Amino acid sequence: MIHKNWLEKETIKKVKCVQTNAKKYIVNRVLTPGKEYEVKNETEEFLFVVDNTNKVGGYYKEYFEEM
């Protein structure tokens, strides 16, 4: 259950949100375009970042650009 420690885990890198135009999910409530986010984990398709709710959430990489 590695996901339970992600909030305290060291930040891997920082990314900047570039858009929140989701086709299937509502992400504009938890991500803000132009804001920087800490990446706690990464997979091929998703970044797990500390979002605007101060919780770790998984989002498609297409919403971000690397800093």
UniProtKB/Swiss-Prot annotation:
* Pfam families tied to this protein: DUF6501
Show the InterPro entries listed in the entry. DUF6501
Q: What is the designated name of this protein?
A: Uncharacterized protein YozC
